[in-house]
């Protein structure tokens, strides 16, 4: 291990341990150059709906692939640079947890208010081809990514099984703190039942 002191002097440290032993080190933070944050403006973002006055860490919209690998945080891949993909593939950072929401490009762009969000599947395919396994999540919103869009998303992800290991479908959550945000409603009971039926009757992933 290479460490650097406060005077920028580097030295090497060798740690000897058995395979099943902990490293015996604790770090002040998971990353040392700051957490990469989300610059999307999703119509369903729960952070935007949070009440004020809570602890500061709850308002951090992290979108950092390193935290995805370490802690299972979901990322969107919209802020990924070429060197980020190269680092993931080189060090085999697997699995990763990806917020998909929709595989139809125009729908994902609309939901995330990001014109680059539609490039998702090419990025997922690149990771899968490099042997990176993926867990996916869909925040399902009425009139956006339900119905045929959800069915297409399921088919697209199912086609990448077993490297795409899971697909979690989460109904949108709404609080009363939505002033000046995109209008959004909850699913009705019949609509929710239709989604469950769609997913339940779809072929199981390989």
Spell out what each predicted region is.
Residues 1:
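Conserved PDZ fold ligand-binding element
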Residues 8-10, 17-163, 173-198:
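Conserved Radical SAM active-site core
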Residues 200-205:
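Conserved small/polar residues in nucleotide/adenosyl-binding loops
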Residues 4-6:
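A generic structural motif
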Residues 170:
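Alpha/beta-hydrolase-fold catalytic nucleophile elbow
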């Amino acid at each position: 291990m290479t460490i650097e002191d406060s005077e920028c002097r580097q030295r090497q440290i060798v740690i000897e341990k058995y395979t099943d032993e902990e490293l015996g080190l604790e770090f002040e933070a998971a990353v040392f150059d700051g957490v990469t944050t989300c610059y999307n403006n999703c119509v369903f973002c729960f952070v935007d709906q949070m009440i004020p006055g809570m602890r500061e860490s709850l308002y951090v919209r992290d979108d950092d692939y390193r935290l995805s690998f370490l802690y299972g945080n979901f990322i969107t891949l919209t802020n990924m640079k070429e060197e980020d993909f190269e680092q993931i593939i080189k060090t085999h950072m697997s699995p990763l947890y990806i917020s998909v929401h929709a595989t139809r490009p125009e729908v994902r762009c609309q939901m995330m208010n990001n014109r680059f969000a539609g490039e998702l599947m090419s990025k997922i395919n690149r990771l899968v081809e490099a042997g990176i396994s993926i867990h996916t999540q869909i925040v399902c919103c009425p009139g956006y990514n339900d119905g045929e869009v959800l069915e297409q998303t399921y088919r697209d992800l199912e086609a990448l099984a077993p490297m795409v290991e899971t697909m979690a479908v989460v109904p949108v959550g709404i609080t009363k703190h939505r002033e000046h945000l995109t209008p959004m409603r909850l699913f009705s009971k019949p609509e929710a039942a239709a989604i469950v039926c769609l997913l339940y009757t779809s072929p199981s992933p390989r």
